[in-house]
């Protein structure tokens, strides 16, 4: 099974290199499967060595977006990272299932910028629990832990534990 996954990863990398050229940089070995990469001509993607995933993994880098994922990161099933500005993920990070990282909004008003966005920075050795969403403009410091189900809308200091408590009844 491990050999099969490695062979699949090599073919995936070769296809990406033929399709996107030097705008995609990939470290080896890479143990990724079921990955969808959508990248516009002006966008760049850098993947560090020994990145692993389990199950569906979507990487979207649009416009002039820049996506960088450090070495030795692990992404569980159903990960979606969509980048129109910049997303930087450090080394040795772990991500739970059903993760969404998005560095822009969809502005439904007429403000001139269709997808206003801001850089997302995730430090080294960060652990993000299942069902989390990380929104534009957020900086998560090294060794931080994000509790399951959190929506991260503001900066998280290094070494801290963040949990987004949303138990209020709205109606």
Show which residues each predicted segment covers.
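Domain-scale signature associated with acetyltransferase and cell-envelope carbohydrate enzymes
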Residues: 1-102, 123-125, 132-134, 142, ...
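Short, acidic/turn-prone active-site loops that include or flank metal/cofactor-
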Residues: 105-107
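Short, glycine/charged-rich beta-strand-loop motifs at protein surfaces that mediate ligand recognition
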Residues: 111-112, 133
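Glycine-rich NAD(P)-binding loop of Rossmann-like domains
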Residues: 112-123
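Conserved coupling/switch loop of ABC ATPases
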Residues: 136, 154
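A generic "structured core" feature
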Residues: 143-151
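Conserved active-site beta-strand element of glycosyltransferases/polysaccharide synthases
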Residues: 162
């Amino acid at each position: 099974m491990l050999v099969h996954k490695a062979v699949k990863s090599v073919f995936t990398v070769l296809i990406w290199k033929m399709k996107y050229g030097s705008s995609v940089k990939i470290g080896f070995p890479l143990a990724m499967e079921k990955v969808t990469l959508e990248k516009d001509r002006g966008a760049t993607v850098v993947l560090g060595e020994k990145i692993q995933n389990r199950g569906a993994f979507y990487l979207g880098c649009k416009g002039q977006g820049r996506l960088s994922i450090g070495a030795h990161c692990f992404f569980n099933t159903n990960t979606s990272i969509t980048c129109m500005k910049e997303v930087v993920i450090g080394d040795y990070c772990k991500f739970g299932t059903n993760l969404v990282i998005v560095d822009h909004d969809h502005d439904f008003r007429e403000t001139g910028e269709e997808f206003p966005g801001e850089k997302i920075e995730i430090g080294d050795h960060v652990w993000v629990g299942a069902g989390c969403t990380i929104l534009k403009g957020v900086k998560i410091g090294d060794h931080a832990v994000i509790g399951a189900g959190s929506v991260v809308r503001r900066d998280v200091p290094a070494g801290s534990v963040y949990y987004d408590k949303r138990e209020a009844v709205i109606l």
